């Protein structure tokens, strides 16, 4: 499947997360992104070094600025189960705006065309690192990394595009 790109409508599919009442929710992407400006940023794995020390902290640190520029939701996405994503989210006590969601089976990652084969590293099929800006489901920015790089998908890169 070809990777998602600018101008595409983000595919519908399901993601899972724990809500503020600690209840597991499985929802369609369209239900949380329709009519909104949403940043969906993907990482290869929870608790991995670049994701934990650079990518996620960047979005947490810039969340207020992103929201001031009209962003309604900031969603961190990974091919992990929702329990792992919940635990990972708790490692950022300063976080007030980034929602940690799971694509447990990797099906949504496949719909996006953003799979990354990390079997040689013992991680299986994961998500490429990326940052998408969605405006009422339409992709207006698609910053997708090659391999395990972290050069175009930061919060700063999204801010520059706003």
UniProtKB/Swiss-Prot annotation:
One annotated GO molecular function: thioredoxin peroxidase activity
UniProt domain Thioredoxin: residue ranges: 4-162
First-level EC class: oxidoreductase
CC per GO annotation: cytoplasm
Xref: SUPFAM superfamilies: Thioredoxin-like
Free-text tissue specificity from the UniProt record: Highly expressed in buds and flowers. Slightly expressed in green tissues. Also detected in pollen.
Pfam families given in the database record: Redoxin
Record keywords: Antioxidant, Cytoplasm, Oxidoreductase, Peroxidase, Redox-active center
GO biological process entries: cellular response to oxidative stress
Domain of life: Eukaryota
InterPro entries given in the database record: PRX5-like, Redoxin, Thioredoxin-like_sf, Thioredoxin_domain
Catalytic activity line of the entry: [glutaredoxin]-dithiol + a hydroperoxide = [glutaredoxin]-disulfide + an alcohol + H2O
Active site residues of this protein: 51 (cysteine sulfenic acid (-soh) intermediate)
Coiled coil stretches, renumbered: none
Cross-referenced PANTHER family: PEROXIREDOXIN, PEROXIREDOXIN-2A-RELATED
Function as written in the Swiss-Prot or TrEMBL entry: Thiol-specific peroxidase that catalyzes the reduction of hydrogen peroxide and organic hydroperoxides to water and alcohols, respectively. Plays a role in cell protection against oxidative stress by detoxifying peroxides and as sensor of hydrogen peroxide-mediated signaling events.
Note: The active site is a conserved redox-active cysteine residue, the peroxidatic cysteine (C(P)), which makes the nucleophilic attack on the peroxide substrate. The peroxide oxidizes the C(P)-SH to cysteine sulfenic acid (C(P)-SOH), which then reacts with another cysteine residue, the resolving cysteine (C(R)), to form a disulfide bridge. The disulfide is subsequently reduced by an appropriate electron donor to complete the catalytic cycle. In this 1-Cys peroxiredoxin, no C(R) is present and C(P) instead forms a disulfide with a cysteine from another protein or with a small thiol molecule.
Protein's name in the database: Peroxiredoxin-2C
Lineage, uppermost ranks: Eukaryota, Viridiplantae, Streptophyta, Embryophyta, Tracheophyta
Underlying gene: PRXIIC
């Amino acid at each position: 499947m070809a990777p998602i790109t600018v101008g595409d409508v983000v595919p519908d599919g399901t993601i899972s997360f724990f809500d503020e009442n600690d209840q597991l929710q499985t929802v369609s992407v369209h239900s949380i992104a329709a009519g909104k400006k949403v940043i969906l940023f993907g990482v290869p794995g929870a608790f991995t070094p670049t994701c934990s020390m650079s990518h996620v902290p960047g979005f947490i640190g810039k969340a207020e600025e992103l929201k001031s520029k009209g962003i309604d939701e900031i969603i961190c996405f990974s091919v992990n189960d929702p329990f792992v994503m919940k635990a990972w989210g708790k490692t950022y006590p300063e976080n007030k705006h980034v929602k940690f969601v799971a694509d447990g089976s990797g099906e949504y990652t496949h719909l996006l065309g953003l799979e990354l084969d990390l079997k040689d590293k013992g991680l299986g099929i994961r998500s490429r690192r990326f940052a998408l800006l969605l405006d009422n489901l339409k992709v207006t920015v698609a910053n997708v990394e090659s391999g395990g790089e972290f050069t175009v998908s930061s919060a700063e890169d999204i801010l520059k595009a706003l």
